[in-house]
């Protein structure tokens, strides 16, 4: 229609519309819808760009939730996927892993206590892990303590080494921030068999706070999958590409953890944020598979 109008500028719009069997009003309504659709796409892309300044690797499903929740933009998942794909904004997952566990240390280890436990509240099970960052030619390490029920990072520490005192600082942060209503209830502390978590000082701190000690029993990463998954999100969705100095790394990690805890919707939490679930203790429905068959049988009850 636009081409015909350009070729025949003296022919009235209603005459051209008559050639195709529709009215002048229908033509202008269609034109307006096309304009509004284009404007809506531009608004969506502008808002996605704004969101990704804080959540650089957020995918389509989570962007859909944040667009509706925080900006009132209600767009279908498939439509948003098409918009993102056409704009070249779809993300590829980063698949890199570096071993940070040394279990041949000869210190006492503990059995895995969480094989047949489905957490029913916050501060029931904490899982821990260490991830590394390459900054200005040096390896830096982030020690994380995560609440298994809510997926919230409750304690963390950035360090230039893997000594147990850094793991202790992360655990102390988690203990200080415990929800008051659960402080008198026991916490199961689950980790791999790394020397940091088996050290005398670390075990002493756990026992001081009446924590039950649980550790992985083999080399299968699925035995500590929640901790490794959260570490991967923090590292790959928020910290890479890592263009920061060593002196600025602490603040960068702080902002990343805040964005993850307080703003990023979580599929396994019915698209709530970890902080919301941790603070409210609301019931969530597990939407992920577990390594242990007992877990999976409970998930289908």
Predicted features by range, described:
Residues 1-10, 45, 49-53:
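Short, amphipathic alpha-helical "recognition" segments used to contact nucleic acids or chromatin
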Residues 16-17, 27, 48, 63, ...:
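Mobile genetic element proteins and their domesticated derivatives, centered on retroelements
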Residues 17, 24-122, 220, 273-285:
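Basic, flexible linker segments flanking DNA-binding modules
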Residues 57, 71-72, 118-120, 135, ...:
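Conserved, non-catalytic sequence blocks in retroelement Pol enzymes and Pol-derived host proteins
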Residues 73-77, 81-144, 168-173, 177-186, ...:
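Mobile-element integrase/transposase regions
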Residues 101-103, 191-193, 199-204, 213-235, ...:
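RNase H-like two-metal-ion nuclease catalytic core shared by retroviral integrases
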Residues 147-148, 158-163:
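A short acidic/small-residue loop/turn micro-motif
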Residues 200, 207-211, 233-301:
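C-terminal domain-tail junction helix/linker
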């Amino acid at each position: 229609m636009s081409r015909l109008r350009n070729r025949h500028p003296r022919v009235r719009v209603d005459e051209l519309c008559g050639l195709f069997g529709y009215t002048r009003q229908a033509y202008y309504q269609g034109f307006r819808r096309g304009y509004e659709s284009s404007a809506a796409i531009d608004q969506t892309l502008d808002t996605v760009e704004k969101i990704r300044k804080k959540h650089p690797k957020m995918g389509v499903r989570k962007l859909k939730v944040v667009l509706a929740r925080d900006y009132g933009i209600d767009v279908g998942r498939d439509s948003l996927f098409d918009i993102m794909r056409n704009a070249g904004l779809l993300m590829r997952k980063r698949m890199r892993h570096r071993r940070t566990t040394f279990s041949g240390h000869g210190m006492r280890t503990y059995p895995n206590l969480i094989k047949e436990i489905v957490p029913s509240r916050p501060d029931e099970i904490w899982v821990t892990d260490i991830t590394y960052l390459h900054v200005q030619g040096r390896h830096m390490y982030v020690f994380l303590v995560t609440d298994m029920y809510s997926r919230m990072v409750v304690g963390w520490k950035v360090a230039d080494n893997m000594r147990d005192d850094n793991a202790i600082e992360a655990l102390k942060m988690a203990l200080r921030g415990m929800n008051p209503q659960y402080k008198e209830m026991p916490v199961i502390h689950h980790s791999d068999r790394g020397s940091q978590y088996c050290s005398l000082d670390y075990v002493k701190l756990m026992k001081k706070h009446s924590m039950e000690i649980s550790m992985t029993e083999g080399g299968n990463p699925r035995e500590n999958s929640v901790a490794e998954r959260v570490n991967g999100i923090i590292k790959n969705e928020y910290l890479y590409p890592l263009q920061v100095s060593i002196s600025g790394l602490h603040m960068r990690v702080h902002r990343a953890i805040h964005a993850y805890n307080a703003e990023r919707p979580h599929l396994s939490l019915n698209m709530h944020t970890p902080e919301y679930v941790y603070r409210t203790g609301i019931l969530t429905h597990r939407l992920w598979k577990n390594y242990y068959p007992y877990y999976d049988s409970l998930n289908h009850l």
